[in-house]
Amino acid sequence: DEMNLLIEMMKAEKYFKKEPFEEMGYAKLDTHREIRSGFPEVIFCARKADAHLLEIFTRLYAQDGEVFGTRASEPQYELIREKFPEVVYDPLSHILKIEKKDKKRIGKIAVCTAGTADISVAEEAAQTAEYFGANVERIYDVGVSGIHRLLSRLDTIQSANCVVAVAGMEGALASVLGGLVDKPVIAVPTSVGYGASMNGLSALLTMINSCANGIAVVNIDNGYGAGYI
């Protein structure tokens, strides 16, 4: 009847007037981020105070029963685990997460590294993509110093919907992959290398200046950014 309709309209008005973030004083949780961009807010754990991290983690978990944090330390993991025993921590990628079981994943992303030293950044990309619903094929240590290693996995790489190329040193892997596949290549320069690599700047400049088509470049060591894209 009209009264019930009016009540429902008032409830709807109250809901839409609610701020699209949760005020915490030291933080403003972006509760509508998934509505706007398709994926919920992620915690950048580095340099956060313990009390702040724990409260942010708790409130994000209360929203949807899932939380994903990047650049977490071992002590931060121990802090979160005291309250959330189910939390999972990967010391290689420094990812901290609680993830729903039996999550459906689609497509295939090939995450490739030039060397073993690049795997920590690659895992940040791979686990981010998996958390947000993609299947990931890991293809590690296939850099240009032994191009035959890359060519031995070319069929798998070419069958992917997207390729992530993670490389330090001179960063040539992204250009090589860009010339071999007809899919988007997301290039991730890493800070791996000797003096003149300038903590990843050399690889970044190589990737930005690539003559191969279809390459997009994220910031140095930004595996999360690549996995999100």
Residues covered by each model-derived region:
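Short, acidic/small-residue loops that bind anionic groups at enzyme active sites
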Residues: V88-D90, L177-L201, I215
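Glycine-rich oxoanion-binding loops at beta->alpha junctions
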Residues: K97, N135-T156, L201-S202, V218
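Short glycine/serine/threonine-rich phosphate/pyrophosphate-binding segments
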Residues: L53, D118-E123, I147-H148, A167-V176, ...
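Long amphipathic alpha-helical segments
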Residues: D1-V87
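C-terminal binding/interaction regions
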Residues: T113, Q158, V192, A196-I229
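Glycine-rich phosphate-binding loop
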Residues: S152-T190
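Glycine-rich phosphate/diphosphate-binding loop of Rossmann-like nucleotide-binding domains
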Residues: I106-H148
